[in-house]
Amino acid sequence: MGRTPPRVGLNLIDEEAFRVAALPLFEAGLVDALEVDIDNEWGASRGRIDPRPAWQSELLDVFAEEDALYGHGVWFSFLTARLDDRQRRWLELLAEECGRRRYRHVTEHFGWMTSGPFIQNTLFPMPYTRGAVELGRDRLALLAAAARCPVGLENLATALGPADATEQAAFLADILAPSGVLLLDVHNVWTQAVNLGLPAEQLLLGFPFHLVREIHVSGGSWFQPEHTADRRAVRMDSHDGAMPRGEVLPLLAMALARCDQLEVVIYERRGLLGTEAEREAYRADFRAVRAAVDQAFASAAPGVEDAA
């Protein structure tokens, strides 16, 4: 008897272009689950609430009632060493949101982006040390207390050197080992591999697959440095471009074959959805992800022997 296939869903984007692009997928019944940037209303504003459009709130409520809603934090700054008032307020608002709607689990980004009064929206890695692991476990406990549901982390795309990529899997495993959830982003794995000249498959195989409950699949873009000696293009996990299928889908297939606790696969894309051609490319990428999942779990369907 095969494994239960995961849900396949979308990350909700706060843009009208997303609503137009994704509507045919919802209408066709292809979206099993919804993930939302759970702190989108208040994360960047130091606690000031910026309410969502009504159509978004209604959509969140529908998926929460179906027990198919997932939360993803952006602005907490998980590994900032000194918890500040903004983060304490963030935790209070997370608790309020998780009391309002039921989430299957809530994840945050690995790394840090806040120092004192500065909020930097580029996440930075942290050296893998015992102190950093203890800090991560403490922050994970704070998330769990606020969310009152399973919580976890997403692997980071940025790296300042090879060790940030090669040690990340063990680093995450040490933090999450007690009770945490790993959100495995395969585009992030490929991004680190490309930028550092490392084999993506080898990086992927280091992750603790038994902790993976969610997978992210996305696209991104390339940045061309202008004022550095090294003029190589840098891959960014910016979600603003089509999915590089030839590179990312094989990594997805590898992960699908190994993640026994996998619950959901989410496709992410934001921006550049203004034309019908861009919207159709978005839908085609989602269908490609869904097809990859269906293919990987084809053996889960009852076969002739089961029917007999």
Predicted regions and their residues:
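Acidic/histidine-rich catalytic cores of soluble enzymes
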Residues: 144-228
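Active-site acidic/histidine proton-transfer and metal-coordination neighborhood
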Residues: 86-182
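Conserved, mostly hydrophobic/aromatic
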Residues: 34, 106, 185, 215, ...
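Gly/Pro-rich active-site loop or hairpin
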Residues: 45-51, 84, 123-133, 192-261, ...
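A short beta-strand-loop structural module common to alpha/beta enzyme folds
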Residues: 32-45
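C-terminal helical cap(s) of enzyme catalytic domains, especially alpha/beta-barrels
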Residues: 276-303
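Acidic (Asp/Glu)-rich catalytic clusters
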Residues: 23-30, 48-71, 88-104, 141-146, ...
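Boundary/entry segment of secreted carbohydrate-active catalytic domains
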Residues: 1-22
